[in-house]
């Protein structure tokens, strides 16, 4: 069966959003937006706290396992130009717009769990995980009473066209994996993927049913990468390979530059239980600040 035949477009949801906004010329949508934006902490936080402590579920579907491993091991902290940082920020702000659209058509949306915290999943002793965009009830394209994961993404025109033509699984497999990992860990059977074309504000919606095989395969991949002391193979041995040329880890991976000096690039560091890291040399637990500094006995992991 082709992937195209398995795509379930969320046409009822998209049509309801467009009709609702047109009916009152966006009044209800804007009112909801005003209530939602203050809760989008990621859009206006200050310092980002440095390297991410965990391996993210949003990355685990990526083609290159070595790049994922390098990121988890803090090999190189990328510095982005202002345009790219504004692009990241736009993605956070768009979440508020998506939520306001759903609220304006009567969908119930939860951005936080019962403890008032962002929906998060955890795996591999807490070293692998991520946070979902929300949970919804009352999505027009799903049976009544179905709670569904929410995932929101922004796309440029070329990427958006691929999404419309091929569906999310074929055109953005990392997103498909991310959603299934979240649904599997959260006990949800379905999800709603909403995307916007940043160039013309066209919307795309897709219903995703839990794919247990894919979810378990990539949860297993995440666990293996977390505890792997040796770097996985490169996707290409050529530094000129087009995917490698655009990778943040190319300087360390292909050009033999030194990785950043920190505990995670040291041969003595080991991920352990309860999301902790330990030092085999000093026989101690390493908190995040200590990991970032390293120590005088630092010895670069030869895998870098």
Please annotate each region the language model reported:
Residues 145-152, 189-193:
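Conserved active-site beta-strand-loop modules that form the wall/rim of enzyme catalytic pockets
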Residues 5, 162, 166-176, 181-278, ...:
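Metal-dependent nuclease catalytic regions and adjoining charged, substrate-binding loops involved
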Residues 154-156, 197:
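Short, histidine-centered active-site or binding-site loop motifs used for metal coordination
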Residues 1-149, 156-158, 296, 304:
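Metal-dependent nuclease catalytic cores that hydrolyze phosphodiester bonds in DNA/RNA
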